[in-house]
UniProtKB/Swiss-Prot annotation:
The modification N6,N6,N6-trimethyllysine is found at K14. It is an enzyme of class 4 (lyase). Binds 1 Mg(2+) ion per subunit. This is Ribulose bisphosphate carboxylase large chain. The modification N6-carboxylysine is found at K201. It comes from Carica papaya.
């Protein structure tokens, strides 16, 4: 161990306060394959040197506190401390820089996203010496990944369960999200599924309210699924939201869904919490249920560029905690999401190995060592005119989810579903024939609408609808 990184905690105790950088800033440190690596965007208070701010982040998110303590001499600080091993400026930002911090693996409980986040981001974000702090990325080492189950099933197992290959899956969020009775809700589900969708979905805040208790909703949705399957010959599903006020109630709802023969359930993983989510993911694997994940509340954490946590970190955490689908923005719809950044974390969700690529916001090479992948879900303000772009951007291993873009069809839910299915099939066929979806997309949709009156009606309704606002979160 080099003299610069060694901490002589055992050579007598001297009370007082010393600069964090004397202990936690170690630019000569060589990172280990077992370290968890973090990239923080740091905005220090005026007068705080970058090295001191970076060291403070490493200290306060690992073994350090504001003063020297005599119990430092009872352990090996060098074994357990976090280390700020690199500082680099943020281009175009005078007062910001990226601090790279390495954490020894022994700081973390095996298989616990909850403990990982409690350590890395649990306390340091309120530190007075920092004006703002954002966790941009994490490198999760294979040794730690192997302590997690991850997604209940993964992409290939889901396709095998559904017997659907060679195209994105189609979904729809039932609207209005609140206020429908269980029977009318089930009717809307049935119409969408018989029209050609693969899935329908509870919205994130549909749990068990006075107008529609969860058990009634589950029963009517199961009836809709079976009826649509009998009519179409295709396997169908509805994301039954099992999110609840307690873990016990959540599992009770999941058990009932399994008893009904439902293929998939749903969880709001941020509002529900990582402990609840991991518990549900384990239940789903043990009982053959797919698990759809909604990211409700994510923008509270990830939207501001200078403070919080980037969604790519939340996406990695979800892959560890467990989920077969997760909402990931659309690039072209109503929700925030710049293209290169979005595709960066989409690859982190799906692929087994992702190289470092700063142009897409990926700070570290990530090896998932065979952990199953997660299907990204594109949802929010999308309609048939977006289908070519969505197919080109997200590829086959994705779920394209049209809520208003199905239920807002002038002829009703089933024709809305038909329009989306026809548009998707046309785009997939055109792509397979070698046509350029990005350049010829509108023409492909127009050609398909000539033999599909449902698609033609949808094209007319949404021909002027665009959501063109600059992204807040950019590279």
């Amino acid at each position: 161990m080099s003299p610069q990184t060694e901490t002589k905690a055992s050579v007598g105790f001297k009370a007082g306060v010393k600069d964090y950088k004397l202990t936690y800033y170690t630019p000569d440190y060589q990172t280990k394959d077992t370290d968890i690596l973090a990239a923080f965007r740091v905005t220090p208070q005026p007068g705080v040197p970058p090295e001191e701010a970076g060291a403070a982040v490493a200290a306060e998110s690992s073994t350090g506190t504001w003063t020297t303590v005599w119990t430092d001499g009872l352990t090996s600080l060098d074994r357990y401390k976090g280390r700020c091993y690199g500082i680099e400026p943020v281009p175009g930002e005078e007062s910001q820089f990226i601090a790279y911090v390495a954490y020894p693996l022994d700081l973390f409980e095996e298989g616990s996203v909850t403990n990982m986040f409690t350590s890395i981001v649990g306390n340091v974000f309120g530190f007075k010496a920092l004006r703002a702090l954002r966790l941009e990325d994490l490198r999760i080492p294979p040794a730690y990944i192997k302590t997690f189950q991850g997604p209940p099933h993964g992409i290939q197992v889901e396709r095998d369960k559904l017997n659907k290959y060679g195209r994105p899956l189609l979904g729809c969020t039932i609207k209005p999200k609140l206020g429908l009775s269980a029977k009318n809700y089930g009717r809307a589900v049935y119409e969408c599924l018989r029209g050609g969708l693969d899935f329908t979905k509870d919205d994130e805040n549909v749990n068990s309210q006075p107008f529609m208790r969860w058990r009634d909703r589950f029963l009517f949705c199961a009836e809709a699924i079976y009826k649509a399957q009998a009519e179409t010959g295709e396997i169908k599903g509805h994301y039954l939201n099992a999110t609840a006020g307690t873990c016990e109630e959540m599992i009770k709802r999941a058990v009932f869904a399994r008893e009904l023969g439902a293929p998939i359930i749903m969880h709001d993983y941020l509002t529900g919490g990582f402990t609840a989510n991991t518990s549900l993911a384990h239940y789903c694997r043990d009982n053959g249920l797919l698990l759809h994940i909604h990211r409700a509340m994510h923008a509270v954490i990830d939207r501001q560029k200078n403070h919080g946590m980037h969604f790519r970190v939340l996406a990695k955490a979800l892959r560890l905690s467990g989920g077969d689908h997760i909402h990931a923005g659309t690039v072209v719809g109503k929700l925030e999401g710049e293209r290169d950044i979005t595709l960066g974390f989409v690859d982190l969700l799906r692929d087994e190995f992702v190289e470092k690529d700063r142009s897409r916001g990926i700070f570290f090479t990530q090896d998932w060592v065979s952990l199953p992948g997660v299907l990204p879900v594109a949802s929010g303000g999308i309609h048939v005119w977006h289908m070519p772009a969505l197919t080109e951007i997200f590829g086959d291993d994705s779920v394209l989810q049209f809520g208003g873009g199905t239920l807002g069809h002038p002829w009703g839910n089933a024709p809305g579903a038909v329009a989306n299915r026809v548009a998707l099939e046309a785009c997939v066929q055109a792509r397979n024939e070698g046509r350029d979806l990005a350049r010829e997309g509108n023409e492909i949709i127009r050609e398909a609408s000539k033999w599909s009156p449902e698609l033609a009606a949808a094209c007319e309704v949404w021909k002027e609808i665009k959501f063109e606002f600059p992204a807040v979160d950019t590279i």
